[in-house]
Curated annotation (Swiss-Prot):
Binds 1 heme group covalently. One of its GO terms (molecular function) is heme binding. GO terms for biological process: photosynthesis. This is Cytochrome f. Its cofactor is heme. It comes from Dioscorea elephantipes.
């Protein structure tokens, strides 16, 4: 009886351990697959290189358009909208990590001038919150509040992303001035082709690593292929591994060249970057401009009145 209880206890512990292990795997895998902006955050101190190139282009190789819209000028300590548009054909499907086809996701990085930052929730109006949807923005670094990243997000719902931005106040931030500032943006649709470690994803074309004859093609049980090539130079065998997702373009017995595509290129997405300018406007300048315009209008009114008065005097003198 005691042995039976011991066996049941051990069995229960093993079952719990397996369950916990599965849960950890699922959670970890989900966090990695759904958090690709963290690749740039972990690998680069600044997402914009000295050349002006945004580092997301290192993984998303295809070039696609992106657009940003901001106000021409804003006042200090004011919340405004920065609208990023990532256009693409909504009918397109991308290759997922499991080799199946699915909808495209989108992501973006917004690089603001120093002092500008994501608006706190209590400063965002209900109208702007409705435009934002359920997106969760985050800072690129805890000490870089002017750089904001978002994604991945469902592309069909968020091909237009509204960032709520709070402008700085030079009265409280002495390193901020009333000037014209640049804003940079990068946006992608779809998965990348290269991982940060340099390895390929299954969302890209695979080329032959050797010239020769395709001697054997083995379709793997879980998807993908093993392609054996007899090297043309010395006859040794080279095995190229193709993951599930890309479509095979070669067949057994075919003669191929070095770097010849073995698969199609399944990528339908891409990355783009753009920029805009915004003026941090001094309220005193606006007041001065309004005062100047008012004085000009008053001067014109007085001039017209004076002219009419002069005409009346002339008419009176002519009557006598």
């Amino acid at each position: 009886m005691q042995n039976r209880n011991t066996f049941l206890g051990v069995k229960e512990q093993i079952t719990r351990s397996i369950f916990v292990s599965i849960m950890i795997y699922v959670i970890t895998r989900a966090s990695i697959s759904n958090a690709y902006p963290i690749f740039a955050q972990q690998g680069y101190e600044n997402p914009r290189e000295a050349t002006g190139r945004i580092v997301c282009a290192n993984c998303h190789l295809a070039s696609k358009p992106v657009d940003i819209e901001v106000p021409q000028a804003v006042l200090p300590d004011t919340v405004f909208e920065a609208v990023v548009r990532i256009p693409y054909d909504m009918q397109l499907k991308q290759v997922l990590a499991n080799g199946k086809k699915g909808a495209l996701n989108v992501g973006a990085v917004l690089i603001l001038p120093e002092g500008f930052e994501l608006a706190p929730p209590d400063r965002i109006s209900p109208e702007v919150k409705e435009k934002m949807g359920n997106l969760s923005f985050q800072n690129y670094r805890p000490n870089k509040k002017n750089i904001i990243v978002i994604g991945p997000a469902p592309g069909q719902k968020y091909s237009e992303i509204v960032f709520p931005i709070l402008s700085p106040d030079p009265a409280t931030k002495k390193d901020v001035h009333f000037l014209k500032y640049p804003i940079y943006v990068g946006g992608n649709r779809g998965r990348g082709q290269i991982y940060p470690d340099g390895s390929k994803s299954n969302n890209t074309v695979y080329n032959a690593t050797s010239a020769g004859i395709v001697s054997k093609i083995v379709r793997k049980e879980k998807g993908g292929y093993e392609i054996t090539i007899i090297d043309a130079s010395d006859g040794h065998q080279v095995v190229d591994i193709i993951p599930r997702g890309p479509e095979l373009l070669v067949s057994e017995g075919e003669s191929i060249k070095l770097d010849q595509p073995l698969t199609s290129n399944p990528n339908v997405g891409g990355f783009g970057q753009g920029d805009a300018e915004i003026v941090l406007q001094d309220p005193l300048r606006i007041q001065g401009l309004l005062f100047f315009l008012a004085s000009v209008i008053l001067a014109q009114i007085f001039l017209v009145l004076k002219k009419k008065q002069f005409e009346k005097v002339q008419l009176y003198e002519m009557n006598f």
